[in-house]
Structure formats: C-alpha cells, structure tokens
Amino acid sequence: MDTKRVGILVVDLSQWGRKEHFEAFQSFAQCTFSQTVQLDITSLLKTVKQNGYKFYPTFIYIISLLVNKHAEFRMAMKDGELVIWDSVNPGYNIFHEQTETFSSLWSYYHKDINRFLKTYSEDIAQYGDDLAYFPKEFIENMFFVSANPWVSFTSFNLNMANINNFFAPVFTIGKYYTQGDKVLMPLAIQVHHAVCDGFHVGRLLNEIQQYCDEGCK
C-alpha cells in the first residue's frame, strides 16, 4: 500500500503496475529517452499578446500545469524510496548577455496563471542579475526547462554522465519560426525510462499542443 507523508506519496513497489519496468530500467537497461516535436503556437502567441504576457514564463506555466497532472513526471528517489511529489516546481534558465553564461533559477508553481506569472516576475527581479549558477536556494521537488532561442532544431538530446535516480523531466525550447500561416516551435523532452514510457510522453506532448491550440483558456 502506498504511504502518504508530508509533501510526498511513497510508492509501494510490490503493488505498482510498472514494478518490472522500473526494475529493468534501473538496472541492466538503465536509460533515458528523448522526443522532439514542432509545436503549433500560432494561437498561443495571439493569447500572449492579447493579455500582455511574456512568452517564456507563459510557456513555463503551461508545462508546469500539465506536468503536475501526471504522477510519472513527479517521481523521485528520496531516502531510498520511490516517491511522488504532491507538486513539482519549474526550474528554468536565465541567460546573461554580458557574460554569455546562464543561471538556473526556479519559481513556485501555482495553478492560477496570473499568480504564477507574478511569482516568476518577482524571482526575476530579485535574482535575474545574479550571475551565480544557482542564485536561489535549491529545492528537491523540481523539473527543468531550458531555452535555446537562437536556433530551431528537429532533435535534441542531453548526454548525462550519471542518470541514476534522476527522474525529473527536462524540457528544451527552441527558436520558433513561420511555416505557411502557422508559427511552429521545437520542444524537446527527456525522461528516465524507469518512471515513464513513450505513451506517457506522447500524452503529455499532445496535451501541451491542445493547450496551445486553446490559447490558455
């Protein structure tokens, strides 16, 4: 039986439907996998403009909202146990033009978009000029978003030296571009196969596209 504790749910592996998959991808078949799609953000850009939002934090919010819907993207190893965080917060990169480096910042997730965007703006105001890699105290319950707005791409992969027990999904956003009457944007996701499969990634990517189509309604 799964056990509830403050902030987490401890998974009872003996009762988990993915027990064998988890054990396989934690041992002899340990791996991550990546998938890249070209999102249609035409409607989303219109919504962002109409509401006076900024695109980057708006898209971070969309990913955060949908990631938090699914347990497989909130999993982690904690004190030797597989757990599911009650919620996860987005970590994201901030580029510093003067040094051509970046910082890894994070903001608390809020389901309400305006509250999240306010929190994001406050964090940028406080930490945005700090050149440290981690300008803000690190927390455990995070996933990660990065942006490479200088180029578009059709494939993206992170080659991690040590993937053991790193279950947080990593998203990478590319430069958006016009194709016909649409605006498309590359989005890559990398996940650990121990906690999710192609089905889960496909469902999430389809939900992100649907949310973009509906314009944050």
From Swiss-Prot:
Oligomeric form and interacting partners: Homotrimer.
SUPFAM superfamilies according to UniProt: CoA-dependent acyltransferases
Active site: H193
Gene: cat
Catalytic activity: chloramphenicol + acetyl-CoA = chloramphenicol 3-acetate + CoA
Enzyme class: transferase
Top-level division of the source organism's lineage: Bacteria
Recorded GO MF terms: chloramphenicol O-acetyltransferase activity
Biological function: This enzyme is an effector of chloramphenicol resistance in bacteria.
Transmembrane intervals: none
EC number(s) from the headed UniProt entry: 2.3.1.28
InterPro entries linked: CAT-like_dom_sf, Chloramphenicol_AcTrfase_AS, Cmp_AcTrfase
Keywords: Acyltransferase, Antibiotic resistance, Transferase
A Pfam family reported for this protein in Swiss-Prot or TrEMBL: CAT
Record family assignment: Belongs to the chloramphenicol acetyltransferase family.
Protein name: Chloramphenicol acetyltransferase
Gene Ontology biological process terms, A to Z: response to antibiotic
Keyword Magnesium: no
